[in-house]
Amino acid sequence: MALTASVKDELSRLDIKKSSVRKAEVSAMLRFAGGLHIISGRIVIEAEVDLASTARRLRAAIAEVYGHQSEIIVVSGGGLRRGSRYVVRVVRDGEALARQTGLLDGRGRPVRGLPSAVVNGSAADAEAVWRGAFLAHGSLTEPGRSSSLEVTCPGPESALALVGAARRLGIQAKAREVRGVDRVVIRDGDTIATLLTRMGAHDALMVWEERRMRKEVRATANRLANFDDANLRRSAQAAVAAGARVDRALEILGDDVPDHLKYAGELRVAHKQASLDELGRLADPPMTKDAIAGRIRRLLAMADKRALDLGIPGTEANVTPEMMDE
């Protein structure tokens, strides 16, 4: 099951007893998933959601908390839409429910944000607002660099109300307008985890955290692999450059090279891409890395001094830009 669907499925099965909390959730669901329509002179409330379990939860809450009946209409997917959608419709007593849930104010005017009783409610009410908004129009992407939890909002007022509810929970969320659509977005992984916990999606959080950890381990492994590859490449480049310098050193010094330095230099030339450790093991008798490095260093210093005395190019002259290319 996709992450968004698993979160919604879990939230739709969450058992809430407190009346004020259930009211806050219903108000948010109707605000973020619904709308008011005038049909034959009567106010009808419709809320469209993407899971049958969410529709059943809303229908049950409307009946148990407010005492109004509703119906669920299944809208089959077609065109760009995949999967069925579920519309919870309240025809009879639609106006009464709209007033009770804060979709209409005392004068019968539409409320654009959330009702003040919900906005100024408890922390549990703020959690319920987020739960209802997420069930209505929320999404959660896979953890990673572009992970996000977001809710599509019916307008800027409801987006700001949702940001305010997050703030009451100590959570930072941002309201944004993207291509004319208002959204509230959370991108920080730890903050997403906190909100999932506060909403009550504990099982989904475990799945999300496991995937998050797996992504982080994989990213770390890739970084280390790239680091190792880069180090190996640089080591090989340094070895090739050293081989070219030794070639020039032997040319400059000719027969005036002490045998032990000449032997080390010839090893370097013969095995241009070998590491100093490998050169030491190839020597007969074997030498330590420091011993072979010391001999090559003295050979190069001797050759560069001779080149300076003679006024000719030193050992660096043999190192070309191509040898140092990444």
UniProtKB/Swiss-Prot annotation:
Keyword DNA-binding assigned: yes
DNA-binding region(s) in UniProt: 275-308
Pfam family membership, one: HTH_WhiA
GO biological processes: cell division; regulation of sporulation
Keyword Heme set for record: no
GO molecular function, one term: DNA binding
UniProtKB keywords: Cell cycle, Cell division, DNA-binding
Listed InterPro entries: Homing_endonucl, Sporu_reg_WhiA_N_dom, Sporulation_regulator_WhiA, Sporulation_regulator_WhiA_C, WhiA_LAGLIDADG_dom
PANTHER family to which the protein is assigned, alphabetical: CELL DIVISION PROTEIN WHIA-RELATED (PTHR37307:SF1)
Physiological role: Involved in cell division and chromosome segregation.
Family designation: Belongs to the WhiA family.
HAMAP family according to UniProt: HTH_type_WhiA
Protein name stated in the entry: Probable cell division protein WhiA
Species: Paenarthrobacter aurescens (strain TC1)
